[in-house]
A protein has these predicted regions:
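Acyltransferase
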Residues: 26-34, 63, 250, 277-302, ...
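Short, solvent-exposed turn/loop segments enriched in Gly/Ser/Thr/Pro and often Arg
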Residues: 124-132, 304-307, 390-391
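Glycine-rich, small-residue loops and helix-cap segments
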Residues: 25, 74, 80, 115, ...
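A short helix-breaking turn/cap at a secondary-structure junction
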Residues: 194-287, 474-490
Length: 490
């Protein structure tokens, strides 16, 4: 089909640049949506990153109330098939058990996304209920990493990252409850920010009852796209359980200035876990770059009982997920998850967590509090802490050890297999602090390797400032002169 841009031109535009062209009436929102749909047709057979396209939103971008004269002005956008609902659209959460599920209303963030001028044209792949580290359920779909389709996408924002990395579109919705924005962003050469609590609403379905470990966000190829997304989509809904805060200056403006020289701690030894030796050498290269930019960097690890923290976080996930599944069962009039519709590890998580006591939950929350206080003290001395985004190389497809298709009979053992590779990102989810994966390195396989910067609560702007400074140091674009094996411009 004819497209409004060449594929090279399309791939060179971020969402902010597309929005500017829309504002100048050089292109229309329908033309951009059609080009994104053509991009899906071009690369999705090799990736399985996009679950569904919404034909009416492609033909008529004003469908469902998208504001075409606001913010992004109709730039095409994918919603992860998990998280805030999209009214009347399928949201099947990567599960046979949820087939046919259609939310009756837009989630609050969905409304903000529409008001920001983003045209929701489809939904992206996720592991079943977002639980595991890769979207690989042959009964539903198997998503692939566009940098090398023999490798996993990681997760749970699997399809979002694969789509943006492959050039389908420049910006996509993502969620993060332990690293699900940052980890796949790190393996796809993207920017992935997990914001501080109180930035993106989780209304109407969720509140503090979940421990508030999960939040919303996006993945992008440019820092300014992430900054603009936050500026446009942040804010709380009526009846929130906590105040939702705003920065004193829009991030889109703030990122144009370099941060002041920062004190950055660096580590790869996180309790019982440490990074692959190649990752350590890449971490050392990042340290050198930061020092060249004028930052003070020292090898220091936060004084935290990581073993206790991981145990508490595991309790949180197990108890949260068990109650989530139990509510679904009650709505469907079932007493147990059907084994032919729900993946085996997810059934075992439900079994283990269903009868967790209030005392166990209290102990978990007590650890959350003590770890948060300890980390807060650490950030009195250090502006940030730097690690790799994950500790071990991206696995090849089909590595069942990390999948909810695993036959591991021990749920705790399965979670600790995850922590061995996803070691560094859960801390920010537990404490409600901010973390960002920045595409600064490569794995021995050639896949991208993100570098993960964490900081104190409400210091998200400084993370973005540093990311923008690093982006400028790379010549204005991360990972220049290279692109994935599967890409719209190939």
């Amino acid at each position: 089909m004819n497209t409004v841009m060449s594929w090279e031109e399309w791939a060179a535009h971020d969402a902010t640049a597309l929005a500017e062209r829309l504002q100048q009436r050089e292109v229309t929102a329908a033309e951009l949506a059609a080009q994104a749909a053509a991009a899906v047709a071009k690369v999705n057979p090799a990736l399985n990153a996009v679950v569904e396209l919404f034909d009416d939103a492609i033909t008529n971008p004003a469908t469902d109330g998208t504001q075409l004269d606001s913010g992004f002005n109709g730039v095409p956008f994918l919603m992860k098939d998990l998280g805030p609902g999209v009214k009347g659209r399928l949201q099947e959460q990567g599960s046979l058990f949820m087939q046919g599920n259609r939310p009756a209303e837009d989630g609050f963030l969905t409304q903000k996304i529409r008001a920001a001028g983003l045209n929701i044209i489809g939904r992206s792949a996720t592991p079943e209920f977002g639980v595991c580290g890769s979207a690989e359920n042959p009964a539903v779909y198997v998503a692939h990493n566009p940098w090398n389709p023999d490798y996993t996408t990681f997760g749970s924002s699997a399809g979002a990252c694969a789509s943006v990395a492959a050039g389908v579109l420049p910006l996509a919705h993502a969620t993060d409850g332990g690293g699900s924005i940052r980890i796949p962003a790190g393996s796809h050469g993207l920017i992935g920010l997990k914001s501080t609590r109180g930035v993106f609403s989780i209304a109407p379905a969720l509140s503090d009852i979940t421990g508030y470990v999960s939040t919303q966000g996006c993945v992008s190829r440019s820092v300014r796209d992430t900054a603009n997304f936050i500026d446009r989509c942040r804010g709380g809904a009526p009846g929130e359980f906590m105040p939702y805060w705003h920065s004193s200056e829009p991030y889109a403006t703030l990122i144009n200035r370099d941060p002041q020289p920062l004190r950055i701690a660096v580590s790869h030894e996180w309790g019982n876990y440490s990074a692959d030796p190649h990752f350590v050498s890449e971490l050392e290269r990042t340290v050198t770059l930061l020092q060249e930019l004028g930052h003070q960097v020292e090898w220091v690890t936060p004084n935290i009982d990581f073993e206790t923290a991981f145990a508490a976080q595991t309790t949180c996930y197990i108890s949260n997920f068990a109650q989530f599944i139990q509510r679904l069962l009650e709505k469907k009039g079932l007493t147990a998850p059907p084994e032919d519709k729900v993946e085996p590890i997810n059934i075992r998580i439900w079994q283990k967590g269903l009868n967790m006591s209030y005392s166990e939950r209290w102990q978990m929350q007590d650890v959350f509090n003590s770890v948060s206080r300890k980390l807060g003290e650490f950030y009195q001395q250090w502006d940030m802490v730097l690690t790799p985004t994950f500790a071990k190389p991206t696995p090849l497809m089909g590595e069942k050890r990390y999948l909810t298709l695993s036959d591991n009979p021990d749920v705790l053992s399965w979670f600790y297999d995850l922590w061995e590779i996803f070691s560094y990102t859960p801390l920010a989810s537990l404490t409600g602090t901010a973390g960002i994966s920045v595409p600064l390195a490569r794995q021995a396989s050639g896949l991208p390797l993100g570098m993960h910067f964490q900081t104190r609560q409400a210091n998200d702007g400084q993370l973005l400032q540093l990311a923008a400074q690093l982006e400028r140091a790379m010549g204005g674009r991360f990972m220049p002169h290279t692109r994935p094996q599967v890409h719209v411009a190939r």
